[in-house]
Amino acid sequence: MIARMSTRRRAREIVLQLLYEADLNDWRDAATSRKFIRSRLQGRKVLTDFAAELLDGTMARRDDIDAKLTKLSTNWALHRMPVTDRNVLRLGAYEILYSGTPGQVAISEALTLAKRYGGENSPRFINGVLDRLFKYHSNPESVSS
């Protein structure tokens, strides 16, 4: 189980790299992204498929995810957030909303990414936003607009 979690974590790290890149540059095509993922995950099909699903899903639903994050990230415009934080939030939000990953697992994994790649305040900020998103997704009346 530990190996599975750490390898899935590695897949998430690779997806974060690609989301970061897509945020700053033109989006790679899916074939180029899959090739990058496959090379970083040493061709492991299950992990490559997992990473590709996270990347493709996050990119396909980015506008919807951004709208939800904007609504729930009080006093923070998405475009003003650090690029890393914004993309950790997008990935975590995709997992909570669409992937079937349990909410607490998605939040925990996002916090791990934030601690590793974000700034000093990133984990606390990301935890707050994703926790609100998870609560809202679970029960829309639980979070005020």
From Swiss-Prot:
One GO cellular component this record assigns the protein to is: cytosol
Q: Molecular function (GO) terms listed? A: RNA binding
What Pfam families does the database record attribute to this sequence? NusB
Question: What is one Gene Ontology biological process annotated in the Swiss-Prot or TrEMBL record?
Answer: DNA-templated transcription termination
Q: Which UniProt keywords apply?
A: RNA-binding, Transcription, Transcription antitermination, Transcription regulation
| Source organism superkingdom | Bacteria
Family, as annotated: Belongs to the NusB family.
HAMAP family, alphabetized: NusB (MF_00073)
According to its UniProt entry, the function of this protein is described as: Involved in transcription antitermination. Required for transcription of ribosomal RNA (rRNA) genes. Binds specifically to the boxA antiterminator sequence of the ribosomal RNA (rrn) operons.
The cross-references to PANTHER family, in alphabetical order and at most eight, read: ANTITERMINATION NUSB DOMAIN-CONTAINING PROTEIN, N UTILIZATION SUBSTANCE PROTEIN B-RELATED
List the protein's name: Transcription antitermination protein NusB
Q: Which organism is it from?
A: Rhodopirellula baltica (strain DSM 10527 / NCIMB 13988 / SH1)
Lineage summary: Bacteria, Pseudomonadati, Planctomycetota, Planctomycetia, Pirellulales
Q: Which gene encodes it?
A: nusB
